[in-house]
Amino acid sequence: MCGEVRYEVSEPFVSANYCHCTRCQRRTGTGASANGRTAEGSFRIVKGEEFVKCWDPGGGGFPKCFCSNCGSALYSQSPDGGQIAVRLGTVDGNPGIRPEKRQFTAYAAVWEPIPDDGLPRFPESSRVQ
């Protein structure tokens, strides 16, 4: 990140996962996005709120928020409220959690094979299975 946006998470992440959906691939330029979930009330922008832009992809996707200065993907907002999915790569230091599952593996990038790391795999969202 360029440093224009700073945030804090006041409570520990409640879960973390790798998302292999094509939206995450396109938004991050990677084969999977590592996300930590936290309660919406525990996430707060402390600097540069004017640089945070959010885009709603529609079609059931979560609104994606990013830094308008450097383009870094920062977090997603659950459409039903309640949770924020923070991109773990934007956390300063140790986020205190490691991804414990992989979701949307049916859409995994052919150019980046999913590692054999023993994590549970879900072809679609892990929340509906």
Q: Where do the model's predicted regions map?
A:
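A short Gly-Trp-Pro
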Residues: M1-Q129
